Amino acid sequence: VGEGGTAAPCAAIAAARQGTRTALIHARPVLGGNASSEIRIHISGADQSLKQTDYAEGGLVYEMMLDNKACNDDFCYSIWDSVLFEKAKAEKNLTVFFNTVMYDVETDGDRISAIYCFQETTEMRYRFTAPLFADCTGNGTLGYFAGAEYRQGSEAKSEFGEPTAPEEANNDRMGNTI
């Protein structure tokens, strides 16, 4: 699983819970991406406007939020970092590689077969192979390295039927997670 924003621990934990030996590779020293103590943008997600009362986060995000609420009522971001770390550490099939930058991929046809990484704190180089990789970078970094098509900006409401999407596609980008 590439990177450590909110989506990455969810993907990695889900894979590990299904019995898959999983590596979570993150360039930073804490999980959470923009929602970590490094950036401090809260997870707004499905209820981002606080007006969409029919929408809420579920699954692992909700599980993490409940764990956080139990020990972090004032929402201290450093404690949130610890909640995410402990959640990942609790999974026996999951290994987290902090301070590890992905810099290249190998492909076999149209599939990624390996990724190359450098761990800055140990100066170790890694080559990870797997039948499946999850690009949770937020920027599509693995896909970009592999030559995948990509787009930037917001899609029009008509493209995917999202009720809160703009009427017309645009180049706007979000500054927060989920």
Predicted regions mapped to residue ranges:
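N-terminal Rossmann-like FAD-binding beta1-loop-alpha1 element of flavoenzymes
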Residues: 1-23
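A secondary-structure boundary/capping signal
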Residues: 2, 26-27, 98, 129-130, ...
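Stable alpha-helical elements in mature extracytoplasmic
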Residues: 8, 80, 84, 138-142
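Short, solvent-exposed loop/turn and secondary-structure capping segments
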Residues: 12, 33-40, 127-128, 140-149, ...
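Conserved N-terminal/central alpha/beta ligand/cofactor-binding core
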Residues: 14, 20-21, 26-111, 151, ...
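Short beta-strand segments that buttress and anchor functional surface loops
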Residues: 114-119
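Core beta-strand elements of the Rossmann-like FAD/NAD(P) dinucleotide-binding domain
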Residues: 122-132
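Glycine-rich loop(s) and the adjacent beta-strand/alpha-helix scaffold that form part
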Residues: 135-178
